[in-house]
């Protein structure tokens, strides 16, 4: 759900790491992104961590921009095909409630890199 240019930058940045782990090639990643956008959630049970699986949903602000994500990680056997849609639906409902409660004037949402810089600068002064 990111703007095209931002999505492409994220893919370019992360692709070497994904390839290094044998996790995804670029075509598979792009296919997974398209599927996630269409269904509204993403699920991975690929063996990155043997026996683990997860599902994640985006959290949108009042303008429909993705600002966060909610996810659940569990044992792969607990996130089976019958249970997965229910877990995704619960996460989606919670993400909508969270998104509706976000303050649109919070500078952290509008300029996350500035907010993180301020936090890091403050921490540097404390150390």
What are these regions (language model features)?
Residues 1-48:
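Short, solvent-exposed recognition segments
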Residues 59-62:
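Sensor-regulatory modules in signal-transduction proteins
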């Amino acid at each position: 759900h990111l703007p095209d240019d931002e999505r492409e930058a994220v893919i370019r940045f992360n692709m070497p790491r994904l390839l290094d782990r044998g996790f995804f090639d670029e075509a598979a990643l792009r296919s997974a992104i398209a599927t996630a956008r269409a269904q509204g959630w993403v699920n991975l049970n690929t063996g990155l961590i043997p026996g683990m699986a997860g599902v994640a949903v985006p959290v949108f602000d009042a303008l429909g921009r993705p600002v966060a994500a909610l996810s659940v990680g569990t044992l792969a056997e607990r996130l089976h095909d019958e249970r997965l849609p229910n877990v995704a639906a619960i996460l989606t409902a919670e993400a909508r409630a969270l998104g509706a409660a976000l303050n649109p004037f919070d500078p952290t949402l509008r300029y996350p890199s500035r907010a993180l810089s301020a936090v890091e600068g403050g921490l540097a002064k404390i150390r």
